[in-house]
């Protein structure tokens, strides 16, 4: 993830291992239990009881920013690390995927197919433990691509050697294509998604970001105006769509109503103060 935007500079000091789940849990747990002198000053100077949850390097593990995070879908109020510790990993949360502004729901079907195939590719590919140098190398590559990915001929580091984003990307796509040929999945759709990605790597003018630039410049409008116009167009599309609701829409609406009912139950049933709730959440529901 880029260093542009919201930052917690203390996180730059963290080296959270992705080699083993136990290491990931232990190191994040240590960060949530280690007091930061910098954050301690906030607690002592503001005079507000709940100016922050705690003065630790991480207040809770959810504050840790990374491009992906292991998650548990176990339904409980326990903290995420405790759920991971007791129930394992159910899914991977991808946190650095740009929305496609030209798609009403933010992502296209072929994009979803590509992500599915890419995750399967990552799962089956040999992955050795990362050392500190390799972890920093990955971090530096992420920063370069997130900030300068549109620059022609951008070079990043692969095993201490330089390689262009384009060449490495094409290597990965070739390996993903081999995976399709060896599996029983619906090959045609996945081949199409790979073909689309390959074209964008070979010609960055075909990427959504390039289309954004072109429309903003050609229309002589600001980025904000561009976003507003696109949002209005998507809104009209939804409003003008068929009155018949899809199964997904019904599921979402049912979930909204269920959440409202559960919220009211909590309000009426709980006499616990926020202070007690916070102590219970931070202490009783943390991993062992």
What are these regions (language model features)?
Residues 1-83, 104, 133-136, 154-158:
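Loop-rich catalytic cores of soluble enzymes, especially ATP-dependent carboxylate-amine ligases
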Residues 70, 74, 103, 124, ...:
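Intrinsically disordered or highly flexible coil/loop and linker segments, enriched in small
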Residues 87-101:
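Glycine-rich, often proline-containing surface loops adjacent to acidic residues and nearby aromatics
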Residues 106-127:
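Short secondary-structure subsegments characteristic of cysteine-rich extracellular domains
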Residues 120-148:
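Flexible helix-coil linker/hinge segments at domain or subdomain boundaries
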Residues 190-288:
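Extended, compositionally biased alpha-helical segments that mediate assembly or anchoring
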């Amino acid at each position: 993830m880029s260093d542009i935007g919201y930052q917690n500079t203390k996180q730059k000091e963290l080296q959270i291992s992705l080699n083993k789940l136990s290491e990931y849990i232990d190191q994040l747990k240590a960060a949530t239990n280690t007091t930061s002198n910098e954050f301690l000053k906030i607690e002592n100077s503001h005079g507000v009881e709940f100016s922050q949850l705690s003065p630790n390097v991480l207040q809770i593990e959810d504050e840790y920013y990374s491009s992906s995070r292991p998650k548990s879908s176990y339904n409980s109020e326990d903290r995420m690390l405790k759920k991971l510790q007791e129930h394992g990993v159910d899914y991977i949360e991808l946190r650095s995927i740009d929305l496609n502004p030209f798609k009403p729901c933010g992502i296209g079907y072929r994009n979803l197919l590509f992500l599915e195939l890419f995750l399967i590719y990552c799962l089956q590919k040999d992955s050795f433990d990362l050392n500190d140098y390799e972890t920093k190398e990955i971090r530096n590559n992420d920063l370069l691509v997130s900030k300068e990915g549109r620059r022609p001929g951008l070079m990043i580091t692969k095993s201490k050697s330089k390689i262009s984003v384009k060449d490495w990307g094409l290597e990965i796509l070739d390996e993903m294509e081999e995976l399709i040929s060896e599996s029983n999945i619906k090959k045609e759709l996945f081949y199409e998604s790979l073909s689309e990605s390959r074209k964008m790597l070979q010609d960055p003018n075909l990427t959504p970001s390039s289309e954004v630039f072109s429309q903003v410049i050609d229309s002589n409008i600001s980025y904000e105006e561009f976003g507003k116009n696109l949002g209005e167009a998507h809104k009209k599309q939804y409003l003008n769509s068929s009155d018949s609701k899809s199964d997904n829409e019904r599921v979402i609406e049912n979930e909204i109503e269920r959440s409202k009912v559960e919220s009211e139950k909590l309000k009426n049933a709980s006499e616990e103060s926020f202070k007690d709730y916070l102590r219970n959440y931070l202490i009783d529901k943390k991993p062992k």
